[in-house]
Amino acid sequence: MMKFMCLFVCAIAAVSASDYGNVGYGRVPVGGLAYQVQPALTVSSIVPVGGYGGGYGGGRGYGRGYGRSVEVPVAAVWTPNSRYGVAPVDRQALGLAKLSLAAPGAGGPLVLNEPRRIIKVSGYGPQRGYKQPLGYGSIEQAQGASAAAASSSVAGQNKGYQNGGY
């Protein structure tokens, strides 16, 4: 629907273009050229424009005296004589920014809901050190990232990487 409306407006603009005020070099025939006007995206890019004073801090902060930089909206098309948009170097970044703006929300983060696991622990069996309790009762088993960290630390202790007993 939006594309249809935009094409409709462009067609009307092309048909109703007049020769009034179009004096000078490089004149275009009546109705020969129509520009598609789109609202600027909310993404902006900091573009260095040369000169002295300014920098990224606006003359007050970091980069004073190293040239001016302006914040411009990201446009779909950049031409050397236009003052709108960014250089073609940022074309990939522009595509990614448009995709991120147009992408639907993914919702909340994916969470793996595991049931709580209670393990009965007895005092029998090999003991790894005096720091570990005898283990009568029940403990809750680690889940997710905690389980990975716990298993890696246990693997390290089994391979002889544990600290001295102090």
Curated annotation (Swiss-Prot):
Signal peptide location: 1-17
Keywords: Secreted, Signal
Superkingdom, natural source: Eukaryota
GO CC terms, sorted: egg chorion; extracellular region
Pfam families in the record: Chorion_2 (PF03964)
Main localization, broad class: secreted
Coiled coil ranges: none
Cellular location(s): Secreted
One GO BP: chorion-containing eggshell formation
InterPro entries on file: Chorion_2
Function comment: Chorion membrane (egg shell) protein; plays a role in protecting the egg from the environment.
UniProt record similarity statement: Belongs to the chorion protein S15/S18 family.
Protein's name according to its UniProt entry: Chorion protein S18
Gene name for this UniProt entry: Cp18
